[in-house]
Every structure is written in C-alpha cells, then in structure tokens.
C-alpha cells in the first residue's frame, strides 16, 4: 500500500493512499488524482478510513514546489509530498471542467461518461458516482466547492448523486466568480454580501463590492465538516476553483483578496493572482 501523509491539526492520525485501491476493492474502477485517507483513532488504517479528496482547477504538477517549481510558494502542498508519496503518473480525465469531474465521479473514460463538454448536461439517476458507492459502505458523504455536474431542479444535483451534504457552486460559470452574490447549501441559496452588477443567469460576472471571498467560506465549511465528522467514516470531496481565473474578469484574471508576496514582483497582474 502506498501512503501520502499531510498534517491536519483537527485529526490525530492521517494516512494517504491511492483512491483507486479502495474503489477497486469495492468493485468500481477509478482514475486517482490525489486523495487523503484520515484515520481518527488509530495509527493503523481501518477498514473504513476517512477520505478527503482535493481537486483544484487549473493546478498543474508544474505549479508545485515539490515537482521542482521555484517561483510560486506552495509550502503546505510541498509538505504533503515530503511526508508521503509524490505521484508521477496521474492524469485528469479531460482538459475542461465538467467532463473531468464526470470522469472523476463515475470512474468512466471520457469517451463513455455522459458529460463530455461544458454544455451544462446533468448526471442521470442511473449514473453511479463514487459518493454512492461509499455511502453504501457506511460513509457520510459531502461535496464542498465546485460541482458542475447538475444544476437546480435537475437529476444531477449533488444530493441526488450520493452526497449527503453540499456547499458551494453548482454551475461552472458561477464558480468563475470568487465574489458571487450567493453560494448553495444543499438546494438552498445562501446570500452573500457581494454585489455583481452584470450577473448572468447562473451567478457569473464580476463583483464591484467584494466583501465575501468564496474560497474563505468554502475552506471554513470544509474544516468545520472535518471537525464535526471526525469520529465517523466520511468522504469529503473538496473541489476548489482556485487557481482558475475568473473568465468574465478578462484581463484581471484571478480574483484574490490580496497578492501577498507577489504584489511587488515584476509579473503581469493575472500571474500575480495565480501565484497568490
């Protein structure tokens, strides 16, 4: 068994292994990207370890210090690699958002999964997701972040696809906006303080009153979920939009609260935001 370890202060023991090994054991083939298995009471891996699967948009292996990159600071991810296993042959299911997520969730090849582009097609009731498989094995299941596989009123919303809990974005374009007017908690809109004068029908656009940064809220929600469910087997799919740019912001690129160490560098503004 290969392990990949990262320190998390809320959990006593953390053990990382290849996601595909567990899913193949359960009878579902799967392409693994990066996954954490979290044991909450014993240093040995239990039959049902807690699972945190982190997915980040537009983050390539060449963006991380642990693969030799020296311009962008990624100390926490580098520590994960140092403490565990650094994968060298892992591939995304597609080059764009929705089909890549569909491959990830269903374990199907991009040529066989229902969703093959960003045309807002939802998953069907008969599609089997990893969340459904794990739920049958006694796991609590949660998606926090970006979904993109089904919008309000469709068969593809997270709680119809095996997830007990959802917080974040349903629509791809909505997820471009880091200061949206709302996020979703299950099937309920959660209003935020931001204003978006040119907001489209799904929540995309550019805010002119940036008060609530979505990914601060998403990470707070994720940490709260881990803390609340630490004593029971859970699967947390943490799907982050960062470092994807806000496409609707055009030349502004990545929207971040502050540029931090990159503010004074002689870089184009989008690259500063990407680094931050």
Predicted segment positions?
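N-terminal secretory signal peptides that target proteins for export/translocation
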Residues: 1-22
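Solvent-exposed, well-ordered amphipathic alpha-helical segments
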Residues: 2, 35-38
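Sensor of tandemly repeated, compositionally biased sequence architecture
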Residues: 7-9, 36, 146
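Formylglycine-dependent sulfatase
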Residues: 19, 39-276
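Bacterial N-terminal signal peptides
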Residues: 25-36
């Amino acid at each position: 068994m290969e392990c990949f370890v990262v320190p998390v202060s809320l959990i006593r023991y953390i053990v990382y292994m290849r996601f595909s090994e567990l899913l193949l054991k359960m009878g579902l083939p799967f392409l693994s990207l990066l996954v954490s298995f979290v044991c909450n009471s014993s240093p040995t891996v239990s039959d049902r370890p807690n699972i945190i699967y982190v997915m980040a948009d537009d983050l390539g292996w060449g963006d991380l210090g642990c693969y030799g990159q020296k311009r962008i600071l990624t100390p926490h991810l580098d520590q994960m690699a140092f403490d565990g296993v650094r994968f060298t042959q892992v591939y995304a299911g597609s080059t764009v958002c929705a089909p890549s997520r569909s491959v990830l969730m269903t374990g199907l090849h991009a040529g066989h999964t229902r969703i093959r582009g960003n045309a807002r097609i939802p998953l069907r009731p008969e599609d089997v997701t990893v969340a459904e498989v794990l739920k049958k094995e006694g796991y609590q299941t949660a998606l926090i972040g970006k979904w993109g596989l089904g919008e309000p009123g469709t068969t593809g919303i997270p709680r119809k696809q095996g997830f007990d809990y959802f917080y974040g974005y349903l629509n791809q374009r909505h997820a471009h906006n880091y200061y949206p007017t709302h996020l979703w908690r299950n099937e309920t809109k959660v209003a935020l303080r931001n204003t978006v004068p040119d907001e489209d029908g799904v929540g995309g656009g550019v805010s002119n009153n940036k008060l609530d940064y979505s990914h601060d809220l998403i990470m707070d929600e994720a940490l709260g979920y881990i803390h609340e469910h630490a004593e029971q087997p859970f699967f947390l799919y943490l799907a982050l939009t960062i470092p994807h740019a806000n496409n609707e912001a055009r030349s502004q690129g990545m929207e971040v609260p502050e540029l931090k160490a990159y503010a004074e560098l002689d870089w184009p503004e989008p690259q500063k935001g990407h680094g931050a």
